[in-house]
Each structure stands twice: as structure tokens, then as C-alpha cells.
């Protein structure tokens, strides 16, 4: 009788072992097998104050400051990308629908992948600290008459090493990645609005 119980127990273990080694059709396994992990994610670790201003004219902060980090999609190190472009534009209204006349979107800073030399304390990933004086923003728009209060929209573009079908570098920005990456996990809105007191 003891032999029969042992034989049944061994048979159950063998059947369970063989069935656990077979390929799974579960949705999570399909996700892991089919998801594209190429590319990188740009995270905003710190963002500017809600209101910035000009030196001598305001008590508000006089710098546009961001701390950003980049993570490779598949977790490898260092991340593979070409550069991060920081573009700005000033609007008359908070919903960024009426731009200030003569103040188009401009690239105010380009950060090459080789410039990401520091490691963030938050995630131990390559990071870069951006600090642009508000006076430099104003001088980027010579001759423009600014309203007393404007709304500065900062757009980030992450230029990848991968090429699209036309042979151009893939660029992630607020138009094609903001919705999927703006949540708390990714913390990557690609677009940031700041009130600018002129």
C-alpha cells in the first residue's frame, strides 16, 4: 500500500513538473514577450517654482530649474539616445492657446547624451541639472513686448538613436508620448507650464 501511495505521489509531481514547463498563453506572458522595450524615458525629478520672475523686479525665483534623468527602456545602462532638446514659448493665457506676438517656440538648450555625467540620488540613473536665468529667456526674444504676466511653456524632446521608416531619428515629445508617460510612475510629462512675472 505504501508503494502505491509513493507511486501516485511521484506521478502527480511529474505531471505537475511537465505542465509547468510548457509555454503559457496568459496575457501577462504575451505582454512580456511582445512589448517593445527599446528606447528611453525622460523623467523630471525636480521642476521649477510655480512663478518665476526677473531679478530686481520681483521677489520670485529668477531661474528656470529642472533636474532630469534618462532611463533605458530595457533597463540597460547607460541609456541610448542622441540628445534632449529643451524648447520654450511664452503665452498670454494659462491654457497656452494665445502666444505672445513675436515669441515663437525656440530651442533654449540642447543636452547631449554625453552630458548626462551625474547620477541621480533618486533612481541612480544618469541625470542633468538645468538652470536657465530668466534674463536669458528674455534676451532670447529681442524686441518682444511681454505682458505683465505670461505663461512659459517648456517642451522637452528626447531624440533617440533609433530611426523611423524615413531614416530620421525617433523623437519623443508631448505630442506623441505625453499621455502615456505623464503618470506618477514615469513622471515624464515632456511639457511643463510656469507663470512668468515680467
Where are each of the predicted segments found?
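Sec-dependent bacterial lipoprotein signal peptides
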Residues: 1-20
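Short, charged low-complexity linear motifs
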Residues: 6-9, 174-179
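Signal that preferentially marks extracellular ectodomain short beta-strand elements
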Residues: 115-154
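Extracellular recognition modules
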Residues: 159-161
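Acidic/polar, low-complexity intrinsically disordered N-terminal segments immediately downstream
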Residues: 4, 22-118, 150-155, 164-169, ...
